Every structure is written in structure tokens, then in C-alpha cells.
Amino acid sequence: MNWPFAKKCSILAKLAGIFMYRKIALAIAFSPRMEALIAETKRLVGVFDAELLLIHVGEKTDELEEKLDLILEAHALKGPKTSVLWKEGKPAKRIIQTCEEEQVDLLVLGALKKEGLLTYYIGSVARKVIRKIKCSVLTLIEPQLSTTQFCQVVINGTQLDETPHVIAESLKFCRTLGATQLHILNDIPLYGLQMATAGEGSGDEIALTRRKLVQEEINYVQGILEGLDQSELKVNIKVTAGKWAVELVRYCETIQADLLIMGDQRGYTFIDRLFPHDLEEILAELPCNLLIVK
């Protein structure tokens, strides 16, 4: 890991008054990817000058405790700003409860890149946590010991109540972590219906309607960006007109995005999951790492 880079980012964050995350938690299972997740979280803790909380839901044994201690020592994480909590019970419920009690600002999770159909309908631990937890959640699909650099970042810019907050927080996050290229993706609501109505006119009228719809979405995002610090960031606004979740995943795959940032969408029932919302569709097949801003 490039610690001079992390230190520089931390100093810049402090000078800019950006204290996004005071406490960062990592939910750990004793899997082969645990050390990589710890390494990734260490980078975030260093960059944001945050406290680290490790949460394990399951049996605590001398063997597991020793294994974790060795990893923490290897990564220089044994200190007053690191704490470990061992919990028992249902993983999702205990993780959510612990993060609330400990006033966690960001939770880091590991996730499989693809999940099976049965898991999708029942709901995995990670998905339950993402839906119900009150803090922001960063889900890493391929954590690395060398840590992941977020270079190509895609942000959901669709017109929702939380979008201005999501974009503002995304810019802070990306500037602090040294991301360079941001793509804000926005879709045209009811595009098919609007174009069908315009289809009654001439070819020029149809083209004019299409350009107007696209420009309205660009203006919406530009209005949010005004007044936000975009220094050292290259921001690209992209407007789509297809099924939003599909287009978002496709765009992430096309540009080989390192990170997708979205806002929170709450209130799902089992029936809702049978007819997926945008977030559910993306959680079913993550195109890249995912940050849910809350």
C-alpha cells in the first residue's frame, strides 16, 4: 500500500474540513478474504483518520482470536483506535444493532460478485444489512491485500429526493480517496411515453423533443454540481433512456468502473423483491464495488 499517498490524502481531507467518517466498521467472517478486507479497511481508516471497529458475529474461540490478532499485528492495527467486538445471534440483526449502538458512520462488507436465484429471494446477510442499516455501506466484491484504487467511479444521478446529497457526498469521497474520473449517470423518466407522444409530430419535432429531454437531465445534474468542490475531478454527465438498473450496470461494465455510488432506497417487502427495484436488481448482480450513501 502507498502509505505516503494515504497520509497525503488524510492531510488534504483535514485541511478541507472533510470528516466524512469518524468511525468505520468492518464485518468479518473467518474466510480466505478476511485479511484483504482488513487491508482495504485500513486504507480507509488512514485516509479518513477514523476509528476502526471490527465486528464478528459467531463463536469466539482462542484460536480465532489469535488468528485475528496476528493479522491485526501484521497490518499495524493493534492500537487505541482499533477495537474488536464479538457478537452472537443472527448476523444481519447483530451487525445493524452494533453499528447503531457504536455510532458507526461507514460499514464495510465483503460480497460475492454473483448470487444465486434462491439467495436473491430469501435475501443474503449483506443485502439485509444494506437495506436496513442507518449508516453508509461500502460493499467490496474483490478486496485486495494491495488495496483497491477507485479511479473510475459511477454515481447515480437519477432525479430522486436524495440525489443532491448523494452527489455531494460522492464528490467528497472521491476527492479524499484520489479518484480522478467521475461519471454521473442520469435517466430520462417516462422516456418511452414522452417519445411516443412526440412521435405524432414530424421527424424534426421528435429530434427536438429528444434533445430537450436530454438537456433537462443534464441541467438537473449541473444545477446540483454548482457550488460543490470539483477540484482535481473530471466529471462526465451521461444520460440514458433504457431500463435504468440495466443501463447502470451495463455502463459500469463498459467503462470497467471500480466503484458505483447510489443513494438509499428503503421499505422493501417480500413482494417488492419478487418485482425488483433498481437497488435490488443491482444487488443481485453487482457490476463493481458499491457504496450506498445514507
Describe the function of each predicted region.
Residues I38, T61-L70, V214-Q222:
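Short, surface-exposed alpha-helical segments at coil->helix boundaries
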Residues D204-E216:
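A short acidic, glycine-rich active-site loop
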Residues L37-E40, R94, E169, Y220, ...:
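Well-ordered alpha-helical segments embedded in enzymatic catalytic cores
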Residues K8, A16, I96-S146, R250-K294:
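Gly/Ser-rich helix-loop-strand patches that form or flank binding pockets
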Residues N2, A6, I11, L15-F19, ...:
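Structural beta-alpha unit
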Residues L53-I55, L85, V108, L138, ...:
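Hydrophobic/aromatic beta-strand patches that form the interior of the parallel beta-sheet core
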Residues M34, E88, T119, T163, ...:
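A conditional alpha-helix N-cap/helix-loop micro-motif detector
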Residues L15-E65, G79, Q152-E205, G227-Q230, ...:
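Small/aliphatic-rich secondary-structure junction motif
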